[in-house]
């Protein structure tokens, strides 16, 4: 809550700041996913829309901003793959193919190690969900090089196909 308030203040002071808009969107998405996905609470409508709009604004200002592209791709993916059609329509629609394409583009190496890792983890997760095991294994091997102590990645690479997501 405090982080979202700080992000809102930053956006109020600098409404054309793509980074502040990204953080507002990302923090709202984290809240929605915690409430809905982890806790099972059916709440977060306003936070979802604030996230979607602020990420869209961030990308309008900085179309190549990798972290905003990744967060927005997650919205497209989850709305298209996890929501019933009517709910997906109410949430503004999603696009799984676009989400996978954007995540794949974002998961190319770059100067920003953190943004690259975030995109690569996202791509790996989507590949597992899509049962693209060969692609997921390639992504996991790259992640294992970056994070050799990550037990989930190590298990996936060792198994060759399975993940704790299954």
Please state what every model-predicted region is.
Residues 1-64, 70-122, 129:
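Short coil/linker segments at helix-helix boundaries
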Residues 114-117, 126-166:
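Terminal, low-structured helical/coil segments at or just beyond the last alpha-helical repeat
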